[in-house]
Amino acid sequence: MSETITLMKAHTSVRRFKEQEIPQADLNEILTAAQMASSWKNFQSYSVSLVRSQEKKDALFELVPQEAIRQSAAFLLFVGDLNRAEKGVRLHTDIFQPQGVEGLLITSVDAALAGQNALLAAESLGYGGVIIGLVRYKSVELAELFKLPDYTYPVFGIALGVPNQQHDVKPRLPLENVVFEEEYQEQSTEAIEAYDRVQTEYAGARATTTWSQRLAEQFGNPEPSSTRENLEQKKLL
């Protein structure tokens, strides 16, 4: 097995970090690796806000109370970004259409691909991290904190640092429940219940809810109002 695949299969989320900085040279490598991710038509429809000051991390923690943010050596906010595209379009026409859902898919996928590259690069250098999607629940406040202009929105953040904890790799769904030959196959409730048991066994005494219960908590409720409100304010919907 290649070193790259071994590293990818060993991934765990790290939420506790030592009080050590990430050297600028390593940050440059991580962020340059992020830039090399695939991108729709090479539009590179995302930006990254790098946060290293404790004051800014503390302010962010007040909005998104995840200890990993406060402890991180560096926090990367990945932003879906059509602001740059708007400026490019204006060189040729007065009409700019961010394209609603399609524009959101383009920017979100570009950001996600770059973010995964960044995390993998960080792990290859001995760092750890966790992707934090809860930033979207405070989209309006984050837009103000980070001075995000029109046609931009927070997609997720990554807290990075020197790991101060170790976990076993979290079991994923069986491959046959995710990869289908030739055509889609709907899942049975038995397959969901089986994975509930796998996840509960993995979590042990830490288990408070099952995997399917967490699905119900997420998708049994309306979308967060802040996300849509910010997208409308930033002229993306």
Which residues make up each language-model segment?
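Acidic, surface-exposed loops and disordered segments
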Residues: 1-237
